[in-house]
Amino acid sequence: MLEKLIERVLFATRWLLAPLCIAMSLVLVVLGYVFMKELWHMLSHLDTISETDLVLSALGLVDLLFMAGLVLMVLLASYESFVSKLDKVDASEITWLKHTDFNALKLKVSLSIVAISAIFLLKRYMSLEDVLSSIPKDTPLSHNPIFWQVVIHLVFVCSALLAAVTNNIAFSQNKGH
């Protein structure tokens, strides 16, 4: 009897995630606001914006879109996996959600982080002259911010690759059983 009560209480604690999921949806609202603000800024300066600034603005918008997609993916998958099944109002259900287990979600998150990091590096590359001009010429490599940003990006890439390989090995071993 005590065991059943404990199990029921533990299972009910999944609903503690629901307010966190709602709070994460507010993050989407904030990202949407920042996206629209950046888009408006870009459009309002269209006649004076340089090509480099246009590309940087576009990369910023892509970055925000990736981030919003990542938040939405984690939000929906977390709710569906841990809280409750989503009741679809219409037939346009999200098909990837049915096939997304925890390992697939980890892989999608890892790949999204790599994409976001790559966009960040691309933005830095577009303003490389400004960044390099702010660094003294005899600065050691370990004090160069671009060096560390590339290292961090490579760590993200290696982590995503290791997660994919680990997932692939685990899946192939489970397939045989």
From Swiss-Prot:
It is found in: Cell membrane. It is a multi-pass membrane protein. Keywords: Cell membrane, Membrane, Transmembrane, Transmembrane helix. GO terms for cellular component: plasma membrane. The chain crosses the membrane at residues 15-35, 54-74, 102-122, 145-165. Coiled coil: none annotated. NCBIfam families: HI0507. Belongs to the UPF0114 family. This is UPF0114 protein HPG27_173.
